[in-house]
Amino acid sequence: MSMITERPVSDPAGQSVSATGDGAVGSRRDMRAVVAAYVALTKPRIVELLLVTTVPAMMLAHGGLPSLWLMAVVLVGGSLAAGAASVLNCYIDRDIDQVMRRTKRRPLPAHTVAPRNALIFGLVLATVSVTLLAVFTNALAAGLTLAAILYYDLVYTAWLKRTTTANTFWGGACGAAPVLIGWAAVTGSLAPAAWALFGVVFFWQMPHFYPLAMKYKDDYARAGIPMLPVVASTRRVNAEILVFAWLTVLVSLVTWPLGAGMGPIYGLPTLVVGVIFLVEAHRLCRRAARGEAVKPMRLFHWSTTYLTVVFAAVALDALI
């Protein structure tokens, strides 16, 4: 059964419009809208961020630029896997998404895509991604990919997200998994440097996502999601943001000696953006503690810049 449901196009008199002229234009527009809806289910911006960490990890593992074929396979497989996880997340969370203002325009709550079709789409993407990596890389990379999809959707989305304030922490492993997958695809094993990069992305997710939860606190509360900023005190939220921000920066610096020959090309930019990241984290928490108006999305965006610079430095250092 096709995942794309065609809608009849009629003229004002109620008669069917021919496949040419205005009817054909309308059909093309409908098709583009359907395709756009399926793409939206994959959350492309999240996919992009995951790939930012995957390629540098592969380059560090290889000690330079891996073969273009291997990079293409991992990028395609990784994109499909991340897309699959997001689609299945949208399917499981469709009851929540229709309650939250931030998400009610997503394809499922907006009824642009039928839930059954979204489920099939997500399962197909997951199957293709794992198969691709199993055939063209190795069992470890494929196994990690499958584990990440299952953990994200069945453990985090369906269970932990709805039941514990530590949901962001326990879900962090999924966001950091692409680092391990990329490394494993190159070497077939996981070195200490791979785990260090994993740690950077893992710890980074708390000071990245807590500000987002602060901004949409009322939205999460309306949906009954126990995000830490929704149910905990300002003091508790501030403490976790600062602890994990410091852990992120410290682990990124520990990665310097653990990396295979990484030098100041990695270390200096990482140190500079780490200081800025910590300054922004402390600024947000200080204002929140004083009861002043805060701009949590400032830290959210800075954290994205921080991670991008760190992994760009990993890639550049591996090349030189």
Curated annotation (Swiss-Prot):
Topology class, membrane: Multi-pass membrane protein
Q: Name one GO molecular function term.
A: protoheme IX farnesyltransferase activity
Instruction: Supply the EC number(s).
Output: 2.5.1.141
Top EC category: transferase
Q: Which residues form a coiled coil?
A: none
Tell me the GO BP annotations in alphabetical order.
heme O biosynthetic process
Which residues does the annotated region (Disordered) include?
1-24
Q: Name one Pfam family in it.
A: UbiA
InterPro entries under this entry? Protohaem_IX_farnesylTrfase (IPR006369), UbiA_prenyltransferase (IPR000537), UbiA_sf (IPR044878)
Give the superkingdom in one word. Answer: Bacteria
Q: What is its main location?
A: membrane
Q: Does the keyword Transferase apply?
A: yes
Pathway(s) annotated for this protein in UniProt? Porphyrin-containing compound metabolism; heme O biosynthesis; heme O from protoheme: step 1/1
Instruction: From the UniProt record, list the reaction(s) this protein catalyses.
Output: heme b + (2E,6E)-farnesyl diphosphate + H2O = Fe(II)-heme o + diphosphate
Q: Does the keyword Cell membrane apply?
A: yes
Similarity annotation: Belongs to the UbiA prenyltransferase family. Protoheme IX farnesyltransferase subfamily.
Which NCBIfam families does the record cross-reference, listed alphabetically? cyoE_ctaB, PRK04375.1-2
- In Swiss-Prot or TrEMBL terms, this protein is called Protoheme IX farnesyltransferase
Gene behind this chain?
A: ctaB
